[in-house]
Amino acid sequence: MEVVLRPRLGQAQVQDKAREARVVSSVRAAILTVLHPRTTFSVNLQEMEDDGCLEAACVNASCLALLDASVSLKFLLAAVTVVVTAEGELLTDPTSKQLSRSAASLLFVFSSRTSGEGGPLLVSSYTEGRVTPARLQESLAAAHTASLKIFEFYRTSIAKKFSKEMNS
């Protein structure tokens, strides 16, 4: 699995390469590799605008790109960014301004597979800053709720795509 994240301007920096590695580790888990032996998947991501949740957008875009390319997946992925503000407030899908002022930022990647309790399973998580265990659990719950909306968006997008193809 190869992911190339191209910044909006200039050459890729160290932080861009770290983002690429995190996207690869999340997306690789979703690909059904036994059906694609000795195959390399390459996803090219071009940053158009960074509203603050670039990494989550990259994971979600990669998942949709693989789905659109008819790559067999074990599950779909939904990535959500949550920040803890200096005041202790939780925000999902923060802007870049909110992200820069946050005490901690957390990225959660969920699979469409459900756990025993019926919710999506956590594939990976990344944290920047300090967060208490209680705040981590609250952030996870908020991200879980947001991931359900992302999976619903996937369903409607795929249904629209197939209805257009069937009518053509």
Residue ranges and their predicted role:
Residues 1-168:
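Polyanion-binding surfaces on beta-sheet-dominated domains and ring/shell assemblies
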